[in-house]
Regions:
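Positively charged n-region of N-terminal signal peptides that target proteins for export
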Residues: 1-4
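Non-cytosolic coordination micro-motifs
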Residues: 20-58, 86-156
Length: 156
């Protein structure tokens, strides 16, 4: 009986742990904040193609993913990734806000039907603090989400 109870408790704990969203990470599709431009481009070339390069150290990449159509990548003056934005496909499976991070810890704003969830993630274990922002017109599904260095201005 003790063995059966232990197995049941282990099963319940594993279900609860797998249902909880993971701690947000400072990356999207393998493109991490502070990554060098060369490393970011190598990863991006493996998952998509460059569509536009801006003089302001910004790039737009079309990616081969069922849920994300494009990645926007911005670099700082040292050509290290300062932000990454993922644009959700309109013709693919939708991404729920809660898949990105725990909604209970987000700051939420709704302005003229536009939903915005913001998480401020503290730095720890050698990782810098960063901000995660998810936006969309639908109250459940996002249109885009971004990770950016905590010291950066708002991403439009």
């Amino acid at each position: 009986m003790k063995k059966l109870t232990s197995l049941f408790l282990l099963l319940v704990i594993s279900i609860l742990v797998s249902a909880a969203p993971a701690r947000p990470r400072p990356e999207i599709m393998g493109i991490s904040l502070e990554m060098s431009r060369d490393d970011a481009r190598a990863r991006l070339k493996s998952i998509g193609s460059l569509e536009k390069e801006d003089r302001k150290r910004q790039e737009v990449w079309a990616v081969k993913d069922s849920r994300i159509s494009h990645l926007l990548v911005g670099y700082d003056a040292e050509y290290r990734v300062r932000y990454v934005t993922a644009i959700a496909r309109t013709d693919g499976p939708k991404i729920r806000y809660q898949e990105i991070a725990d909604l209970k810890s987000a700051r939420r704003a709704v302005v003229q039907g536009n939903h915005k969830f913001t998480w401020e993630i503290e730095g720890r274990r050698g990782h810098e603090a960063f901000i995660l922002i998810a936006r969309g017109h639908d109250p459940q599904y996002l249109d885009s989400y971004s990770v950016k260095k905590a010291d950066q201005e708002e991403i439009d």
